[in-house]
Amino acid sequence: MRLIVGLGLIAALAVPAIAKEFVAQPKDFRCLTDGAQPEGKRFHIFGKKRIVKKALRKTNTGRLGKGYPVGTILQLFPFEAMAKRGGKFNKEGGGWEYFKLKPNADGTTEILKRGTADVTNFRDDSCQECHQRQAKDHDSVCEFVIGPEGIGLTDDLVRALQTDARCPQ
């Protein structure tokens, strides 16, 4: 009996270590406008309510501390995303995982590519390398430093690129 109780205790203690890593699934990527949009920013935040609330607070105050919470998904465009995976994943990239996505009119999303420095954006640049170069001191979130205009995007172009096939018409 003591053995069973001991094994149960070990299993219970192991769960928090596993829970510190978030692995995004296609269902985690929804209509862009369903995400929370911080005041004065163009990106949208997704995740569990508690995560979104923390991420919004960090974004709105600009006090990132140790960075965004694990489980945060940030999207500027419906076809790209970054998710704070955490754990031991991508230490050199701040724990972020980058995605190329295909949003579908039926509301679903396909993950075309996921990873670290090997994932490229619509300009064929490494997402991670660009984010690290531009905003390493801001948990790799470029809008704190340069914003979309820093990579040559006008407000009109950003709005056009934010058109999302998953959103109800």
Descriptions of predicted regions:
Residues 6-14:
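Bacterial N-terminal signal peptides
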Residues 1-4:
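Positively charged n-region of N-terminal signal peptides that target proteins for export
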Residues 48-65:
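N-terminal post-signal-peptidase region of extra-cytosolic proteins
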Residues 15-19:
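Sec/Tat signal peptide C-region and signal peptidase I cleavage site
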Residues 20-42, 65-169:
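Sequence context surrounding c-type heme c attachment/ligation sites in exported
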